[in-house]
Amino acid sequence: MDYRRSGFTISTDKSRLDIEVIHHFLDNSYWAAGRSAETIRRSIENSLPFGVYKGDQQVGFARVITDYATFAWIADVFILDDYQGQGLGKWLMEVVISHPDLQGFRRWVLATKDAHELYRRFGFDELKKPERWMERHDPNTQERPDYWKKNT
């Protein structure tokens, strides 16, 4: 599915994604530094990705992890620095939230350190009951040299 505005395109076509651009940005982000290209490929295979393009050049990205029934997690959202300030992040979120396959969910979640105001525009807020949420965190699991060999 493609969306067009002012010379930019947002597409859910996985074949258009530039893994090198995505990997380079994520490797320099606060939330995914050190994530391997293979881990990124696998994460995209198992989610609904949204690429943002200026012509054929990828300039942004987001992905949604979902069961397509009740729950969605928005992850890895970015717009390259040279393209920020043009409303692309807001437009990307509009497209994600309104995607026809992502309607009727009881809960959407995401994590951010620095974009709270952007996400508030789309109805996101702090967890109402954070005491109910737990996580299991092993930041180096996928980056072990033999991880994907044992688990594929």
Residue ranges and their predicted role:
Residues 140-143:
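Short helix-loop capping/hinge motifs at secondary-structure junctions, enriched
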Residues 102-138:
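Conserved active-site alpha-helix within GNAT-family acetyltransferase domains
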Residues 38-55, 60-78:
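A conserved beta-strand-loop-helix scaffold within acyl/acetyltransferase catalytic domains
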Residues 1-35, 130, 145-152:
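Short amphipathic alpha-helix that is part of the acyltransferase structural core
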Residues 83-92:
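Conserved acetyl-CoA pyrophosphate-binding loop and the N-cap/start of the following alpha-helix
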